[in-house]
Amino acid sequence: MTDDLRSAGAPTLEDVARAAGVSRATVSRVINGVRNVDPAIQEVVRQAVSVTGYAPNRAARSLVTRRADAVALVVSGAGVEAGADREGSGSRTAGDQGSFTAQVFADPFFGRVVTGVVNYLRPRGMHPVLMFAETSRARDEVVAYLRQGSADGALIVSTHAEDPLPGLLTEAGLAAVLFARPARPVPISYVDLAHQDGARLAAEHLLARDCRRIATISGPLDVPAGQARLAGFRDTMARHGHPYTPIAEGQFTQESGEAAMERLLAAHPDLDGVFAANDLMGMGACHVLREHGRRVPQDVAVVGFDDSSAALACRPPLTTVRQPVEEMAAEMTRLLLDRLARPTSPATSVIFEPELVVRGSA
C-alpha cells in the first residue's frame, strides 16, 4: 500500500477496500467493530485506513451502530460525600478538588495509562474522554454521561479502596473495566499486577546486595496496591529472617516519600536499604538521603516500583520493579470493547507479571 492509492477527494470506503484488497462490506465490518473478521484482515484494513487517510463519518456511523465511539477514562477518588471533608465535617473546596487533579497530572503513572488507552482506541476510530470523579456529584455526572450515551463505557482508575463508582456502574448495568483489582467484591472486569511478587523481587534484590537494615516506604494503605506491595515485602523479609522491618507510609507522591524518608532516618539512622512502593517516593527518598550525606547506593540502596519516568529522572537512576502500565491499559481497553461487543459475557481479570529493572540506586 502506497500514497498513490489516496483519492483526489476525501477517501471513501471503496478506497480503503481497494488498498486493503478486500470487499467494501469487510471494511465496513472492521470499522464498525464487528467481531467475526479474521484478526489478520482487521490489521490489513486498519493499515489501509491509515494509508488512505479515511475518516469515518461519525454521525452516520453512530446512527447505524448506536455507539458514541468514545470511552470515558475516569480517575475516581475516595468515597467522600459532597459537603464533607476528609475528616467528615466542613465542606470540600475547589482547592480540594484542584489538589486531586494536580496530584493525578503530577504522577507519571496516569500519563502512561492515557498512552496505553489512546494507542489502543485510535486505530479503531475511537477516542477517550477524560473525567474526574472525586466527589459524589462528579460520580453522578459520570453515571449520567454514560446513561445518555455520550460514551459507550468506562475505564476506571480508582485511587481509593472505598471508591463506590465501580459498584454504581455495575448496578446501573453500564459497561466498565477497572485498572486494579476492586477492594470489594464487584462483578466487574479488571487488569492488575502481581504486586506481591513485585515487592518480593525488590526485597530479594536488596538482600542479595547484603543490605540487612532495610526499611520500606509503603504506599497509602487504603489502596489495594499499597496493601499488596507492603504484604509482599514483609512476607519476603520474614522468610529471610527479618520479621520486623521499619515502615513509613507515603501517598505515592515525591513529597510524601521525602517526609517518610526523614522519619525513617530519624528513627533508624543505621539503615542500609529502602524499598519505596513507587518511583516518585523512591526519588524523594534519594533526595533526602543526599541531603543527609548518605551515598546511594554505597551507604543506602534504594529500590522503587513502577519503572516510570521518575526512575530515570532520579539521581542516581532508580532500580525499580517494572509495571507494564501501557500494556495493562491497552488490555483494560480491549476488555471493555469486548464487553461492549458481548454484553452478557462474564466479568474476567488479567494479571500481569512484574520485572526487576536494575539501575544505579541498588
Residue ranges and their predicted role:
Residues 1-70, 362:
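N-terminal helix-turn-helix DNA-binding module of bacterial transcription factors
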Residues 34, 66, 81, 138, ...:
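Generic structural signal for helix capping and beta-alpha/helix-loop junctions
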